[in-house]
Amino acid sequence: MNVRLHNTLTGQKEPFEPAEPDHARVYVCGPTVYDYAHLGHARCYVVYDVLVRHLRADGLKVTYVRNVTDVDDKILKRAAETGTEPTVLAARFADAYSEDMHRLGNLDPDVEPRVSTHLEDIFALVQRLVDGDHAYVSDGDVYFSVESFSDYGKLSHRDLGQMKLGASERLDETKAARKRHPADFALWKKSEEDAWGWDSPWGRGRPGWHIECSAMSMKHLGDTLDLHGGGLDLVFPHHENEIAQSEAATGKPFARCWMHNGFVEVDKEKMSKSLGNFFTARDLFDRVEPEAIRYCMMTVHYRAPLNLDWTLDDAGNVTGFPQFEEAERRVAYLYKTKQRLEGLPPKRVVDVDGPVPPDIAGFAEALRESLDDDLNMPVALAKLADFLKAVNELCDQAMRKKGKAARRAVEQAQAGFRALEAELGIGTESADIILLRIRDRRAKARGLDSAAIERQISDRTEARKSKDFAEADRVRDELAAQGVELLDGPEGTGWTIAD
């Protein structure tokens, strides 16, 4: 295995070397389930899904843990706004999140722990920190003492002496007064008797956000993780605080490698509800194929920002997303190529000597090498484009008059598609089904009725049978004017929407 990844802790691209050479323990911070998954979530979990797929394709056993934060102040706030019980709201959005991840083609993690089922583990870790003088109780809250951990700031490269109070604490002098140092953070938060919370050794309350991930990750993966991942926004304070409390408790390195993906931006601004440029994955599912969203997330390096453009009508309504639409065209091309390969007549595939086209023969290896190099998905997609071009040329050769395709080349092309599915998680669906969905969605977007188009094609077929070629041409031209391209073949007439 020759995987090299950028380690946020060192700022260097390094060989990925799990503690056990054949087993990688991977933890990724999951969502706080108070709303639907947004495009930032989509990007994050596609990135780590590709990572896990690639490590497994390289022969590693991977234990992949991705949590669900179903206890958090944001959930409590949203529940109050909507008049919903917090546990009910969290469960609903957790289920929706899982559905969205499946639609994006992400594999289930091996373990998906929830905070609500790990409270005893959280209690034990907090008590361990209190007993070790790394945490203290203050009026029912429990805080981690950052001054007790000499390496605080090593991930984010921040100096403790320069850290200031957060905005919420500048407004809450009572909370600030409970702390020994302004940067101390809550491990346990006191709550009123009638508020959402749990009984603990320190009174009724709720766990702090940071301690949740430490407790869950160490419960399922041990004291030292091989890789901890998440979005760039989690470097500080979340991951910095995870390191502090975990290493203070165990005396061991918390993670061997830290990996962070970049933001999703719209018109070069970070997505924000206040700016009106905030989109959930579900906002896009009706506009483009979910696999196109997955593909689009791979078009820039995972550490760089993914900047999306949008188109608006005169009233300011969103009418399109050019990058996702282009990604859908590329996904359609992929499936059309796969469909052509699968549909080659057996009599056209023969045993002949000769070299296999290099972009077919070398595709699986080129794909692996691209992902070995800090998960370089844009390069992997460039290799895919070369592969698809070569496969189409192979199919063209086979379908010429008296044309043939070498069986070895066809088999290696089929192996290339299997590698694509295993490594990138694209090309996994039935070509017939996904192309039909894309076609019908494009027709609907143009205000066209698929059933009406089918009727017109049927009328044209009858006209051709009756040798009324003028009528057949009229129907063809009428459909062409609407952007409908007819595909005449030995098994009848199909259709597609022209780009």
Would you name each region that the model predicts?
Residues T10-P15, A19-L107, E491, W495:
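N-terminal, positively charged nucleic-acid-binding surface of large information/translation enzymes
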Residues M1-Y34, D49, E99, E120-E342:
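Alpha-helical recognition segments enriched in aromatics with Gly/Pro capping
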Residues L60, H134, V484:
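Short phosphate-binding/catalytic loops that engage adenosine nucleotides
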Residues K270, N277-D499:
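Structural preference for alpha-helix termini/caps and helix-kink/transition segments
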Residues V68-D73, A94-Y97, L107-I122, G140-F149:
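Short, glycine/charge-rich beta-strand/loop segments that flank catalytic centers
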